[in-house]
Amino acid sequence: MKSLASYYFLYYLGQAALMPYLSLYLSEKGISSTLIGLLLSLWALTSVIAQPIMGMLNDRLNDRRQILMLCTVLAPILAFGFYFFDAYFALLIFSVLFPWFQSSSGSLSDSLAVEIGSKAGFSFGSIRLWGALSFSLASFVTGIVYERTGYGSIFFYFLFINAGVLAVLFLFPKIKASEHKLSMFDQAKQVISNKRFLRFIGICLLVNLSIAINFSFLPIYFKTMGFNKAWIGTTYAIAAIIEVPMFWVSAKLNSKIGRLPVLCMAAACYAVKCLTLAFTHDVYLVLASQLLDGTAYAFFASATVEMVKSYSKDETQATFQTVFAAITTGLGGIIGSAFGGILIDHMGAPFLYLILFVLCITAAVLFVISYKMSSRSISHNHLQNS
């Protein structure tokens, strides 16, 4: 457990050191906003394609750490492409290569962690909280550091931290792949034929759309509502801080009341937060609502990873995790970024959050229905066996 906790602490420390500042670095470098937008769209599209492929490859290897190690080594090296090159064509190439490995590392980490945790007897949430802790700490420190050292230093910090991540990976127990290896076609077939898993993805996509839109457009919401933009950083920090204890709480709740009820609670928290932003004109109430945001994210992130594992077989664990991440986070981010901007331009920011409320409350109801269907199925099987 200590090696996993160290891994998540360092992994999200690295993410916090690089990802929030990469677009800002490109802007400081003189890259136009139009091209930056194109590069970000290309990153998102690449992640949707890369994650399932890397997951399928991971499930076929004898040691499930290998692909993750490869991602840990190549991601910081490829990130330097943005540091050394200015040509548009070169930036486009690195906008495919870098996110191919960077985006895959997150879902592969979760797949490995939940597998180790299930065998060692601890929950995913109790490990993931260390990532939330390091990310929240880094959120306060990195901006101050980069103002002094320059934004070009983000790549060196990312490389240095990833060296630590790689060292910790060698401490992980060697997880062998299933002896029953499937072809990539059969792996894809297992995903497509699993109707319960596909329904679960559909419900989670409603929540992830809300997460993606809120993350991208919260600063614009502040601007359109006339709030002091100096509070924007504080809103993200509040959510990040509350995530730490809430990941611990989610681990307890997952084992006590079940994952689907926890997911229902997460969707309900998001719904209340979005409804608040749709109608309030008080910036302090918006700041307070971020407590719900951080709570919802911790509940949602911890429960979904464990739910996805329950749908998969031993030979397709990484495949299911990466497909889930590609669709809900990757595709959800693309759709959310596109339609969020359109809704704000035509209907205004409060109306956007009213739509997000509808999405989240719909997801909460669907999680309740799924829970009741699951309970009936378990009761029916119990009666048949007895």
Please report, for each region that a protein language model flagged, where it lies by residue.
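Cytoplasmic helix-loop-helix junction between adjacent transmembrane helices
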Residues: 96-130
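Structural signature of the two symmetry-related core transmembrane helices
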Residues: 66-80, 159, 261-276, 357
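Interfacial helix-cap and linker-helix signal at transmembrane-aqueous boundaries
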Residues: 26-27, 57-58, 129, 144-149, ...
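A membrane-interface helix-boundary motif in multi-pass transporters
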Residues: 144-160, 341-360
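Helix-loop boundary and gating motifs at the non-cytosolic
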Residues: 1-44, 197-235, 301
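Hydrophobic core of transmembrane alpha-helices in multi-pass small-molecule transporters
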Residues: 9, 78-79, 88-106, 205, ...
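Juxtamembrane intracellular "pre-TM" segments in multi-pass secondary transporters
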Residues: 172-204
